[in-house]
UniProtKB/Swiss-Prot annotation:
Pfam family, one: Histidinol_dh
Residues that hold Zn(2+) according to the record: 259, 262, 360, 419
Name of the protein in question: Histidinol dehydrogenase
Subunit-structure text: Homodimer.
Organism field: Salmonella typhi
Enzyme class, first EC level, given as a word: oxidoreductase
Keywords, sorted A to Z: Amino-acid biosynthesis, Histidine biosynthesis, Metal-binding, NAD, Oxidoreductase, Zinc
């Protein structure tokens, strides 16, 4: 199905409607699973030697020193333009502002007289950031991960990226307070962060995107007692746009294409009650596509994408909630009026002047978002992902005495005698003191 094919949602059967919202399969092949398992074993048992061998094999790079030196980082920064450095600083300022505002106030309440309950927040002690390499270095992801890690107060923040690491990534890491940077990529980097090596420290939690091998490595280490926690499940990028008759077709097309150029497995969907707008957007997509350097990639993504015509905006919202997109762009008049009805989306962009690119880079929100329908249960990355909550309770003698019979009754009902005894012994001790 080509992207210029308009689909009337209400002419489709329920089965056809479900098929229209089905995402491409992303399950790892048995081959990838086995390869990753072998990599994890080798890195865990052989440490730095295995990391160097994998760099030579997969990255075609002979790595002597795994850790990037301060001199190398300074030299990388010197090679960048002032314009780019200023743009990074501006983005970081907005990211800091938004994520600092997410700081949770402590909870301190007396649930009944003499029973004090608190909730306090502590940072995850050590985190590892994985940043992919390639022709287009994702230095913006460094800003999105390292900034909240710093605000949260994580004691150790380390970064791994395939060698040779781009100057932009090195400078962004320094700008955001990353303490150590390592020339390690792929599944072997995830293994090093999860298990540690002679050079790479073991961390408590791993963040960052990657290819199928990196994704599978994160999955495997997250399920091991000796591994590490991960940020969230990963899948191909996606955007859904809701547009009305007042939308600008060129704007809508540019937003769809900015997602499609991410990769051939990206998915884009347009929902509109106006068939004329849908046709104009399709025409604008073709015009803009011809000028894109990554047109081939975008065209592959568009082959699995949809132009859907609905009866009204309310139906657009209902379909969007059913799909649960990573990015939701609402290019309608009075776009904010629809926000309260949105129940599942990673990040929402309102109006003509809020392109996805703003959130990807510099508005301040985080661009690490749940994909593949995980918006139904997962949130966009934020300060809380670099923190953990801990509860504290303190009962006075009077508070304990007032609550004792309740606890004893509940423990007895669950037939947990030791639980009941822990209370009864104290009750008897208080009676003896009286």
């Amino acid at each position: 199905m080509s992207f210029n094919t308009l689909i009337d949602w209400n002419s489709c059967s329920p089965e056809q409607q479900r098929a229209l919202l089905t995402r491409p399969a992303i399950s790892a092949s048995d081959s990838i699973t086995r390869t990753v398992s072998d990599i994890l074993y080798n890195v865990k048992t052989r440490g730095d030697d295995a990391l160097r061998e994998y760099s030579a094999k997969f990255d075609k790079t002979e790595v002597t020193a795994l850790r990037v030196t301060p001199e190398e980082i300074a030299a990388a920064g010197a090679r960048l333009s002032d314009e780019l450095k200023q743009a990074m600083a501006a983005a970081v300022k907005n990211i800091e502002t938004f994520h600092s505002a997410q700081t949770l106030p402590p909870v301190d309440v007396e649930t009944q007289p003499g029973v004090r309950c608190q909730q306090v927040t502590r940072p995850v002690a050590s985190v590892g950031l994985y940043i992919p390499g390639g022709s287009a270095p994702l230095f913006s992801t460094v800003l999105m991960l390292a900034t909240p890690a710093r605000i949260a107060g994580c004691q150790k923040v380390v970064l791994c990226s395939p060698p040779p690491i781009a100057d932009e990534i090195l400078y962004a890491a320094q700008l955001c307070g990353v303490q150590e940077i390592f020339n390690v990529g792929g599944a072997q980097a995830i293994a090093a962060l999860a298990f540690g090596s002679e050079s790479v420290p073991k961390v408590d939690k791993i963040f960052g995107p990657g290819n199928a091998f990196v994704t599978e490595a994160k999955r495997q280490v997250s399920q091991r007692l000796d591994g590490a926690a991960i940020d969230m499940p990963a899948g191909p990028s996606e955007v859904l746009v809701i547009a009305d008759s007042g939308a600008t077709p060129d704007f809508v097309a540019s937003d769809l294409l900015s997602q499609a150029e991410h990769g051939p497995d990206s998915q884009v969907i347009l929902l509109t009650p106006d068939a004329d707008i849908a046709r104009k957007v399709a025409e604008a997509v073709e015009r803009q596509l011809a000028e894109l350097p990554r047109a081939g990639t975008a065209r592959q993504a568009l082959s699995a994408s949809r132009l859907i015509v609905t009866k009204d905006l309310a139906q657009c919202v209902a379909i969007s909630n059913q799909y649960g997109p990573e990015h939701l762009i609402i290019q309608t008049r009075n776009a904010r009026d629809l926000v309260d009805a949105i129940t599942s989306a990673g990040s929402v962009f309102l109006g003509d002047w809020s392109p996805e690119s703003a959130g990807d880079y510099a508005s301040g929100t985080n661009h690490v978002l749940p994909t593949y329908g995980y918006t139904a249960t997962c949130s966009s990355l934020g300060l809380a992902d670099f923190q953990k909550r801990m509860t504290v309770q303190e009962l006075s003698k009077a508070g304990f005495s007032a609550l004792a019979s309740t606890i004893e009754t509940l423990a007895a009902a669950e037939r947990l005698t030791a639980h009941k005894n822990a209370v009864t012994l104290r009750v008897n001790a208080l009676k003896e003191q009286a």
